[in-house]
Amino acid sequence: MSMEDYDFLFKIVLIGNAGVGKTCLVRRFTQGLFPPGQGATIGVDFMIKTVEINGEKVKLQIWDTAGQERFRSITQSYYRSANALILTYDITCEESFRCLPEWLREIEQYASNKVITVLVGNKIDLAERREVSQQRAEEFSEAQDMYYLETSAKESDNVEKLFLDLACRLISEARQNTLVNNVSSPLPGEGKSISYLTCCNFN
C-alpha cells in the first residue's frame, strides 16, 4: 500500500482485563457487528478501518489484545509502537476497574512516553448491574490525566465517537510532530470507510 492511499496511519491498541469487551468494541467499530458469545482473544489480533476527517484519509490499525495473564508478555511487545492505547474496563465488574493501576504501570514501563491513553468504561447497556460509578471513574481518569468515555459495544453507544475523537487527537498530535507516523506494519483487508467532518473535544 502506498502513502497516497492515506494521509495518516495510526496504531491503536486496546488493553484491559479479559472479558471487558475489547474485541466487541473493535468489531462494532470496524464491521458494525456485535458478536454474541464472543470468546476470549488468544494473543493479539487486529483490524483496519479507514475514516475521512476534514477531507483527510486516516487509516486506523486497531489491535485487540488478550487480557489473560498468560498472554501478557506477548501483548506488552505491542505497546512501544502504539500511537494510542485504549484502556478498557467493564462497568459491571469491580475487579476490572481495580486492575487499572496495574495496566497503567505496564503502560509506563513499555509504551512510548508520547502515547495517548484513553480510559473506557464498557457495557453501559448493563447499567442496572453497574459496580463502578461514572463519578468514580471520572475522578480516576482525571487523576491520571486521561480522557474518559463510557461505551456500549452491544448498543453501539459512543463507540464511533471513541475512535473518531481519538483519530482527531492523533492528527493534532502528529501535526505538532509529537508522534511518529508508523507505516511499517503489514495491512490486512480494510474495513468500511466513513466520513467525519468535525473533530470533537478530546483533551
Swiss-Prot record:
Domains as described in the record: Switch I, switch II and the interswitch regions are characteristic of Rab GTPases and mediate the interactions with Rab downstream effectors. The switch regions undergo conformational changes upon nucleotide binding which drive interaction with specific sets of effector proteins, with most effectors only binding to GTP-bound Rab.
Activation/inhibition comment: Regulated by guanine nucleotide exchange factors (GEFs) which promote the exchange of bound GDP for free GTP. Regulated by GTPase activating proteins (GAPs) which increase the GTP hydrolysis activity. Inhibited by GDP dissociation inhibitors (GDIs).
Residue span of region Switch-II: 67-83
Gene designation per UniProt: RAB30
Database matches in SMART domains: RAB (SM00175), RAN (SM00176), RAS (SM00173), RHO (SM00174)
Binding residues annotated for Mg(2+), in chain numbering: T23, T41, D64
Catalysed reactions, as listed in the record: GTP + H2O = GDP + phosphate + H(+)
Gene Ontology BP terms: Golgi organization; Rab protein signal transduction; vesicle-mediated transport
Documented EC number(s): 3.6.5.2
Positions of GTP binding: V20, G21, K22, T23, C24, T41, G67, N122, K123, D125, A153, K154
Keywords noted in UniProt: Cytoplasm, Cytoplasmic vesicle, Golgi apparatus, GTP-binding, Hydrolase, Lipoprotein, Lysosome, Magnesium, Membrane, Metal-binding, Methylation, Nucleotide-binding, Prenylation
Family label: Belongs to the small GTPase superfamily. Rab family.
Region Switch-I, annotated ranges: 36-44
Domain of life according to the entry: Eukaryota
Topology class, membrane: Lipid-anchor
Record-level Gene Ontology MF annotations: GTP binding; GTPase activity
Residues with lipid group (S-geranylgeranyl cysteine): C199, C200
Main location: membrane
Localisation per UniProt entry: Membrane; Golgi apparatus, trans-Golgi network membrane; Golgi apparatus, cis-Golgi network membrane; Golgi apparatus membrane
Chain positions listed as propeptide in the UniProt record: 201-203
Protein's organism: Homo sapiens (Human)
Cofactor: Mg(2+)
GO CC terms: cis-Golgi network; Golgi cisterna; Golgi membrane; Golgi stack; intracellular membrane-bounded organelle; trans-Golgi network
Protein name per UniProt: Ras-related protein Rab-30
Residues annotated with Cysteine methyl ester modification: C200
TM stretches of this protein: none
